[in-house]
């Protein structure tokens, strides 16, 4: 019913965006919205690479702004995600984007705080519970060394030192206090 009042229901994915009020909702309401979005348009899958298994959650849309809105909502719940442009899709003429949650802690947080109605299976929960999700991911730093010195510039704009980048509060490297 809410989707109808906000003129979201019945729109194509490329035309959808979230009303500003969503970003003021309680965590519980945001979790319910994300749950239903991922239940309808999202996926959860087990990716197998060698002996390791990892879980991937995702949602896709040709609307990059919408993907960034979803990413911001996930960030507020402590769930990290990445947006990728999908290229060379035979059926898709325009640009297409996938938002993916793959980091084990973010996947676990998503499943426990938000869930995907009707899509989470016991096998997904077992992989997370056993701590074997995404075991071989990442890189191991063996050595840090200086290769060359580069110039770095800091540009400050008075009274605008703090700002949001991809939904996270950040600041320039000046002397501002967050």
Residue spans of the language-model regions?
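Internal intein/HINT superfamily modules and their associated LAGLIDADG
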Residues: 1-178
